[in-house]
Design a protein with these regions (language model features):
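Serine/proline-rich low-complexity intrinsically disordered segments, especially terminal tails, linkers
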Residues: 6-7, 15, 190
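Active-site-adjacent loop/helix surface patches within enzyme catalytic domains
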Residues: 105-269
Length: 322
C-alpha cells in the first residue's frame, strides 16, 4: 500500500528534521491547497436526491437513498434514472448494523494483502463526524465513489499499460505534503492504495458539501474514494472533452479494493454506509461531475460478496474459535 507506513514516517520525519526531496516527481511534495481566493458558492436546490439539512441525510430509507445516489450521467450528461433496486449484496446491508465483520478479523486479514499500514493502524478509530467532527453530530453516512477523470489523452489512444504499471498508476501523482489531497483514499488500476486522509478526518470534495448554505455542517458526513480512470475525448463533444473511459472502465482489482474499503469504513462507522456517486451528489450544480464514469454496480456488489466470504460473519468467526 503506497502512502502507508513508509510515506507517513518519511513525512513525519521531514516535519521534525527539515525538508526532504523525493525526486524525480515534483508531485510528491506538491502543494495542493488552492492558491487563490474562492468566492462563496451557493446552490439552488437540495440536489437530485433531496438532502435535508436538518437530519443531514437524503430522502428515504438508506436503501432508497442508495438507489438515488448510485447514478451516473448518460451520454447527454443528464443524470440517469433512479435504480429500480440494489444488488442483493447491497440491499441486505446498506444502512443496517448487522452482518459487519469484527475489527479483529479485519486486522488479521489486512496483512495477508499487504495493507496493514494505516488501514490497520486506524482500524480501531471511528470515522469522522459531521460539523467538522463535532462529537454531538452524526458519524459519516455516505461512502462516495469518484474517479480521477484523468489524465485526459484527448484524441490519442490509451497506452497499453494503463492497467499495469506506468505513469497513469503512479500514486505519487496524488500525494500532497501540505495535507490538502482531494480524497481520503486513491485506488490505482492495479489495486494499490494511497491513504491521503484517514476516514477519521473530516473532509469535503464535492461542490454540494462546500455550498455556503451548509457552512461546515457537511464536513465529515461523506467519505471520499478516488479510483484512477484515464479519459479520452469523444467525437462531437468539443476538443477537450473527457467523455470516454477505457475498456474496462475500472479493473477487477479496483472493484475488489473499493469493496474492501467500503467494508472497513462501515465497520468503523458501526453501520453499513450508503454508497454514493459524485455525479449524483453534484447533479444539479453547474459544471458538475460525471464520475465514476461507467461504474458497474454489479461488479462492486460481487466484489463485496467476495470480500465478505473471505472475512466470514461474526457468528462464523466466533464458531471457529470455539
Amino acid at each position: 500500500m503506497r502512502g502507508s507506513s513508509k510515506i507517513y514516517e518519511w513525512l513525519r520525519a521531514a516535519m521534525l528534521a527539515g525538508p526532504i526531496v523525493l525526486a524525480p516527481l515534483d508531485a510528491v511534495l506538491a502543494d495542493c491547497k488552492p492558491d487563490h481566493f474562492r468566492p462563496l458558492f451557493f446552490i439552488k436546490s437540495m440536489g437530485a436526491c433531496a438532502f435535508d439539512s436538518e437530519t443531514l441525510s437524503f430522502a428515504g430509507t438508506p436503501a432508497e437513498q442508495a438507489t438515488c445516489l448510485m447514478r451516473g450521467m448518460d451520454s447527454s450528461r443528464n443524470l440517469e434514472p433512479r435504480l429500480q433496486g440494489l444488488p442483493h449484496a447491497l440491499a441486505e446491508r446498506v444502512g443496517k448494523t448487522n452482518g459487519l465483520p469484527l475489527r479483529a478479523t479485519l486486522s488479521d486479514y489486512l496483512p495477508m494483502l499487504g495493507l496493514e499500514g494505516e488501514l490497520g493502524d486506524f482500524l480501531w478509530l471511528p470515522v469522522s463526524r459531521a460539523h467538522d467532527n463535532d462529537l454531538a453530530a452524526p458519524m459519516a453516512r455516505y461512502f462516495v465513489i469518484h474517479d480521477t477523470s484523468g489524465p485526459n489523452f484527448g484524441r490519442r489512444s490509451f497506452p497499453d499499460d494503463i492497467d499495469g504499471g506506468g505513469k497513469v498508476n503512479d500514486l505519487r501523482n496524488f500525494e500532497c505534503h501540505d495535507g490538502w489531497g482531494k480524497a481520503h483514499v486513491v485506488i490505482s488500476r492495479t489495486g494499490e492504495l494511497l491513504l491521503v486522509h484517514d476516514y477519521s478526518t473530516p473532509w469535503r470534495e464535492t461542490k454540494f458539501e462546500q455550498a455556503a448554505e451548509f457552512g461546515g455542517a457537511l464536513k465529515g458526513l461523506f467519505l471520499h474514494n478516488e479510483m484512477i480512470q484515464p479519459r479520452r475525448s469523444a467525437p462531437g463533444r468539443g476538443r477537450r472533452n473527457d467523455a470516454r473511459s477505457p475498456d474496462p472502465p475500472f479493473t477487477a482489482a479496483q472493484y475488489d479494493r473499493i469493496a474492501l474499503l467500503y467494508v472497513i469504513a462501515s465497520v468503523r462507522a458501526e453501520h453499513w454506509l450508503i454508497p454514493a456517486f459524485h455525479a449524483a451528489i453534484d447533479a444539479q450544480i453547474p459544471n458538475g461531475h460525471d464520475d465514476p464514469l461507467n461504474f458497474n454496480i454489479d461488479n462492486f456488489a460481487n466484489s463485496l460478496d467476495a470480500v465478505m466470504a473471505k472475512l466470514g460473519t461474526p457468528d462464523q468467526v466466533q464458531a471457529a474459535h470455539q
